[in-house]
Structures are given as structure tokens and as C-alpha cells.
A protein has these predicted regions:
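The alpha/beta-hydrolase serine catalytic core
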Residues: 110-194, 198-205, 209-234
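Short beta-strand immediately N-terminal to the catalytic nucleophile in serine-hydrolase-like folds
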Residues: 93-95, 118
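Gly/Ala-rich beta-loop-alpha elbow adjacent to hydrolase catalytic centers
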Residues: 95-103
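Catalytic nucleophile-loop/oxyanion-hole region of alpha/beta-hydrolase
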Residues: 59-85
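N-terminal cap/lid segment of alpha/beta-hydrolase-fold proteins
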Residues: 1-17
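The serine-hydrolase catalytic nucleophile loop
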Residues: 30-42, 190
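The conserved beta1-alpha1 loop
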Residues: 25-29, 180
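Conserved alpha/beta-hydrolase
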Residues: 44-63
């Protein structure tokens, strides 16, 4: 598979695949890096697409940088999308965990044709509030201190919480498929169901899955899911029509299905944290 290392302004990136009119933007999660896009490239590049994977601040070739926060990452992703729009005719998104949340914020007004979200963080405010509860930190204390280092390795930030509240996800128009793990500890099932229902997303659930898809049976499900939802024939219109046809009646799980094991491969999912 062809591989070209790029520098987009200060953003380290790698482009996989032969020249094509279609490209997938690959956005990793916490503890990830752009090289994770190679595994996804092995699936979509033979189908005639390319993959542009980037390093977010504090990750990969940018480990020495600071700024793994929405007020820095969101403008970066918008700049990358503008770059892609100037060079490719069809642009899709493949993202993980908090990388999916950043992407949902950044690309709401410049949506990709298609989006595949793996273990996406869909309600960041609730996640932060849950972690505040675990750390026994209330809002008054967090506002007074600005930041609070929790015993479980995360730093709670008042500025971050305020930014999250000021920028909720209210708009998403891409044809989207979500792969959700039944044992995900960052996003609960009700949140995933509500998001899928609100934005018309397809939702696939691996009941034995974890936020980080890393065990052989989990990697097999990820592999099969990516194979199913990629390819030149998967246009935005076709995806939407397929989901509408299989959507259950109100009160049921929105566009959801369950998957068991298939053939395993190396995964591009990240550590189970944000």
C-alpha cells in the first residue's frame, strides 16, 4: 500500500493509497496516532479510496505539543477538511472515541459524505460530570480551582467543561454508522441510542465489546463492520435508504443490530479513555 508522509501546516499526516477521487479522513482517539489509519487503509484502499490520517496535539509526532482540547483541535480539523475539499471530490470520515467527538464538533457545517464512528464519545458533558463524581469534585470547587487532578489519571478542567456546554452537538448531516460496545464505560447505551435516533445513524452493537476494540473477537467484529460499510457502492443516499428500510418502530433501538465474531485483524482503535 502506497504511503506518503505529509505536513499540513504544523499537522503531521500520512496519506495511504493510490491517487483517487475519494478519501477518508482518519481521526484517532486518546493515546492513538496517525499510523493507526494503516489498518483501515488496508480495507478501503483496495476499493479505490485513499486514507489521510493525522496526528492530533500531544500524540504521535506531536507528542511534545500541548493542546489536546476542543478550542485547538476543532479549528485544526476544519483546516484539514478545507484542505481535503480542495483536492478530493468525495470525502468521508473514520474516527475513534474522543476523535469522533472532536470531528462532530468541527465538521457540523462542512460534513463528510459518510462517517464511520467507533466507540464515539457522544455526550462529553455527561462524561465529565461522571468523572467529577468519581473524583468527589463539585462545580463550585472546580470553578474555584480551575483544574483538579483526579486519582484515576485525568485532569478535570473548568474551562473544558464550560467549552463543552457552550458548544453542544446540535447538527450532523452525514450518513453515519456507529460501532458501539455493550461494555463501553464512557458512553452509555441510552446516549448512543438517542444520538442515533436524533441524527438518523445506523447503530451496530457488539454486546461483549469494550470501548477499546482490542481482543481477537472484537477486532473481528470491527473488521467485518468496516468491510460492510465501505466501498464505492456505499453512497450517502444508499446508506440512508438502507437504514430507513431497516429502522424499527418508535420505541425500539434506532437502526441497531448486534454482531458476533468474524475474522480478526489488527485494530486501529485506541486505549479505553478520553
Amino acid at each position: 500500500m502506497k504511503r506518503n508522509v505529509l505536513l499540513l501546516d504544523r499537522i503531521s499526516a500520512v496519506l495511504y493509497g493510490e491517487p483517487s477521487d475519494r478519501v477518508w479522513l482518519f481521526v484517532h482517539g486518546k493515546c492513538g496516532c496517525k499510523e493507526e489509519g494503516a489498518a483501515f487503509g488496508e480495507i478501503v484502499c483496495p476499493k479505490g479510496a485513499q486514507v489521510l490520517a493525522i496526528d492530533l496535539p500531544e500524540h504521535g509526532a506531536r507528542k511534545e505539543e500541548s493542546g489536546f482540547v476542543p478550542w485547538q483541535v476543532v479549528p485544526e480539523l476544519r483546516g484539514v477538511m478545507a484542505y481535503l475539499r480542495g483536492r478530493w471530490g468525495r470525502i468521508s470520515l473514520r474516527s475513534n472515541s474522543i476523535g469522533a467527538w472532536f470531528s462532530l464538533l468541527a465538521l457540523a457545517d462542512m460534513p463528510p459524505e459518510q462517517a464511520l464512528l467507533v466507540s464515539p464519545v457522544l455526550d462529553m458533558e455527561q462524561l465529565i460530570r461522571n468523572r467529577m463524581g468519581l473524583a468527589l469534585v463539585d462545580e463550585t470547587q472546580l470553578e474555584r480551582e480551575g483544574e483538579s487532578a483526579a486519582d484515576f489519571g485525568e485532569t478535570l478542567s473548568w474551562r473544558y467543561l464550560q467549552s463543552v456546554r457552550a458548544h453542544p452537538i446540535t447538527k450532523w448531516n452525514a450518513a453515519t454508522e456507529i460501532l458501539y460496545a455493550g461494555r463501553d464505560t464512557l458512553t452509555d447505551r441510552d446516549t448512543a441510542d438517542a444520538f442515533a435516533r436524533r441524527f438518523g445513524c445506523g447503530l451496530t452493537v457488539m454486546e461483549r465489546g469494550e470501548h477499546w476494540f482490542h481482543k481477537p473477537e472484537q477486532l473481528a467484529v470491527l473488521n467485518a463492520w468496516e468491510e460492510k460499510h465501505t466501498g464505492p457502492e456505499k453512497s450517502a443516499t444508499a446508506m440512508k435508504n438502507s437504514r430507513c428500510a431497516s429502522r424499527p418502530s418508535p420505541g425500539g433501538r434506532p437502526g441497531s443490530s448486534s454482531m458476533g465474531a468474524a475474522t480478526a485483524r489488527e485494530s486501529s482503535s485506541e486505549e479505553g479513555s478520553i
